[in-house]
Amino acid sequence: MNGSVLCGLFCFCAFAAAGAADDARLVDTPAKRLSAEEIISKPRPKTVKMRVPDDTRLYIGSGVYENCGRMYAGGFCFTYWSPEKLNYDEVLDLCVKEGVGNTLQFWQSNRTLLELARKAKKLGLYSTCIYSTATNGMAAKISSELGQSWLGHDFGERFSFSLYTDWKDRGVTLRALAEEYMNRVHKHVNDLHAAGWGNVMATSANFSLDYEVAAGTEIPCTEDFPFGDLTLASALSRGLYRQYNLPMWGAHLAHEWYSWIPHKNPYKMKTLETAFYLKYMTGAKLIINESGNWQLQSSLCEDSPMSLMPKPFRKMSDKISSPENRPLLEAASAEAKKKFSYIDYRSPVARKYRKVISDFTAFCRKHPAPKGQPEATWAIAKGNLDLGGASYVPGGAVCGAYDLAKKNPNWMNGIPEMSWETVRKAVMPMPPMLAPNKNIHFSASPYGLCDIVSFACDNVTAEHLLKNYKVIMFAGWNTCSPKQYKILCDYVKGGGKLVIGMAHLSTDEERNYTNLSVEKLVNKGDFTELCGFKVVGETSRKYWATGPSTEKNCLGFVARRRFGYMCLPLGKLEFSAPKENFEELAVDDEDAEPFILRCKNGKGEVLFMNWWAYPAAANMDVGCGSEIEDVGMVGYLYRYAAKLARGNVYITGRDFDNPDEDCGWILYSYFPDEGKVYLLNLDYERERKCVLQQFGDKDFITLKPGEFRIVESVKLDADEKLVTYSTVLSPGDKAIF
């Protein structure tokens, strides 16, 4: 079994054989390496927006694996058996009989894949594949014969920085690593297109999905649950969909493997239902349930039925097929046959999975997925060369670069990666909905949905930003360039509001973020065009920040309420713009040097974080007046900026201005093409209330525990939308996005 298939079967990169991974890397490496700019400049296939089923307006699917009645892996924690029932034909028939979606994702190849896809089409089902191979023109035959019943090829988790330990020829800069990565993706996507597979999808839990799309991938499908926050994953895919004018975007729910909560938690299966509704209301048009409904696979929760299967081998590294282990395996296989009913399609857990999917399918036939994409009037910027993860892992290295980290510890996850946590916790809170278990997958949207806009290779325009987003917030890593700086200037002068800090304007490509300098800043610190000042040096270290006045300002800051410890030098500034262009929003508590500055510029403004570090470094909050629920100085800045971006529809508490505690349990979205608002109460045990403010009206909403509600709203014409995006349709196609 090759490394990529094994990786997909277990959804766990550690299972991929290093040798096979290196083989894939060798196959995907082009003879001539291109620069990122050369890859970006290559023409992409003409975008044809994917048509969706008329009855559901959504592809709802599940993975189809071989049931072979044998052990795939051993280990006291990772033993994984494949049961014997069902065969392929029985899976297809049962899918139709029980209404388990309308799409199947096949893991098979060549003639077997063609025959399965043919039968699926006859049964009225759609097909896609993952990790599949085809020879002798078979891919083109599948694609042409299936027509609109064929969705394309998913290369899965084929690409990762951390799978490879050989650093030869990879370089030691972020740019070199990104280009090496993009070259491999670009070649593989081109090979798939040349073979005739049709649209190319990527299913991955990594945060570098934007580089895969920049290199030519057409349909992003984040592997939700291992990715972490499903709402954040939607923001990434949705932002890429708009930015690259993609055919559609989807979600791959690896719930059985990565929901992680035990079956003894009464909400285990409720979280799968929540995931389907979350993706429906955030704009996905393809949702695949990875496993669990036709057979169980996972041992990643302590009371999984898989944990009751025989475990003849202590170590996962034991070679279960070796001759010396054959007697153990044969004895265990005989015992396992007696327990296959615990993990095959007849098992109670598998039936629960199918019930959730069939119920959701029935719901979609009654309430088809909303047309278009939800209103998202602000975005979090994923900076150029931000190659870390979506969350902060203290023991993790960016790009898996542990060898580089031995020489430069800044290659370990640090303040840049923590800054993603800062913005997420401020505006995308994760309520404790699964107590006593932790919630790491579901965030609310008290400040509205946002997109993630990618600055990868600086392949974005000010026109796109102005067309789509009132506010752009930088949080994690960014390597700035003169090109990017010009984009930001044009965005602000055109009316955009930009939240950005000193560290984001550094040109560093080597993770030397603890040693910032004026010389390393873009334009050597001359931010006159963007902010109206130059950075000429640094102040002494400042320890506390506070409000500039005894009266509360727009951030809610007041003098003598301290934020800190800071322990940070501030930027020493030389102002060139008129004094009235600036407003101090936070200052140090000794000399009133500015921590946060509002800088008006043209039709827009910059909210500038004036310290020599990434945002999270200034978000500690244990000073005078701090309270349990506080989100820190930077957190309040992000919240304020999100409020500035409010669209036609938003929610608040009873003060009609700010989201309250109940709003932190509610996910909502508004689809202007559909003219409907969607609300989901993430609290499975209590009612939650909000004031739904839409188009000047105010409705007092009370959501029952776990309730999903659809509210009629205003359907907008194209020229009435606060945000717009382009579509390219084939003649005769109807617009669905």
Which residues does each PLM region occupy?
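Mature N-terminal, pre-catalytic/accessory segment of carbohydrate-active enzymes
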Residues: 17-122, 126, 142-156, 466-467, ...
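Substrate-binding cleft/loops of secretory-pathway carbohydrate-active enzymes
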Residues: 137-145, 191-236, 258-267
